[in-house]
Curated annotation (Swiss-Prot):
UniProt motif (Switch 1) ranges: 40-53
One Pfam family cited in the UniProt record for this chain: Ras
Role description: The small GTPases Rab are key regulators of intracellular membrane trafficking, from the formation of transport vesicles to their fusion with membranes. Rabs cycle between an inactive GDP-bound form and an active GTP-bound form that is able to recruit to membranes different sets of downstream effectors directly responsible for vesicle formation, movement, tethering and fusion. RAB21 is involved in membrane trafficking control. Regulates integrin internalization and recycling, but does not influence the traffic of endosomally translocated receptors in general.
Name of the protein described by the UniProt record: Ras-related protein Rab-21
Subcellular localization(s) per the UniProt record: Endoplasmic reticulum membrane; Golgi apparatus, trans-Golgi network; Golgi apparatus membrane; Early endosome membrane
InterPro entries xrefs: P-loop_NTPase (IPR027417), Rab21 (IPR041833), Small_GTP-bd (IPR005225), Small_GTPase (IPR001806)
Family: Belongs to the small GTPase superfamily. Rab family.
Gene this chain is encoded by: RAB21
Species whose genome carries this gene: Bos taurus (Bovine)
């Protein structure tokens, strides 16, 4: 759900966005979130059970952004719970391990599911994680980037271990979500019917202080 806080020019608004991370177990989803929100990294593999979330506050070009980042379990037995966590999401980060071809193929299944449930309004990021293991790569960069382009997503390379590409990933996603929210707001102002915007709950609200970060379980290193 996205909410844009009123009270002045657009540049001074606060946007609240929900972002969900999806992907197989062991690809490093939780490591990415912990590195981004708390600048922490743990080599140990601790499995995420169902889902957890962290929050992050940013200021992008004078626009305040509150992110609620949902980290979901990658195990197959939790797959059916996916819709509970990604409904009303403004952005989705689909993570694969560059050393694991199967994890990349599973990303394609998530993309199909998200497009079916949420249409084209959700901003998609496809992320090749663990680039610190480049010598063990089994997913070609060209293949991954070509696929991302074909489904209207953007492709990124990250390493939670080396803290590479993570800030850029989230910053770019936030900018894209702001642009989408502004388009929805203009459409509402013009009296246009926007089913997608209504589904995601884009609305103008008064600014309210957001709660401090709430941490949950972990996933894999990388």
């Amino acid at each position: 759900m996205a909410a844009a806080g009123g009270g002045g020019a657009a540049a001074g608004r606060t946007y609240s966005f929900k972002v969900v991370l999806l992907g197989e177990g062991c690809v490093g989803k939780t490591s990415l979130v912990l590195r981004y929100c708390e600048n922490k990294f743990n080599d140990k593999h601790i499995t995420t059970l169902q889902a957890s979330f962290l929050t992050k506050k940013l200021n992008i070009g004078g626009k305040r952004v509150n992110l609620a980042i949902w980290d979901t379990a990658g195990q197959e037995r939790f797959h059916a719970l996916g819709p509970i966590y990604y409904r009303d999401s403004n952005g989705a980060i689909l993570v694969y391990d560059i050393t694991d071809e199967d994890s990349f193929q599973k990303v394609k299944n998530w993309v199909k599911e998200l497009r079916k449930m949420l249409g084209n309004e959700i901003c998609l990021c496809i992320v090749g994680n663990k680039v610190d293991l480049e010598k063990e790569r089994h997913v070609s960069i060209q293949e991954a980037e070509s696929y991302a382009e074909s489904v209207g997503a953007k492709h990124y390379h990250t390493s939670a271990k080396q803290n590479k590409g993570i800030e850029e990933l989230f910053l770019d996603l936030c900018k894209r979500m702001i642009e989408t929210a502004q388009v929805d707001e203009r459409a509402k102002g013009n009296g246009s019917s926007q089913p997608g915007a209504a589904r995601r709950g884009v609305q103008i609200i008064d600014d309210e202080p957001q709660a401090q970060s709430v941490g949950g379980g972990c996933c894999s290193s990388g």
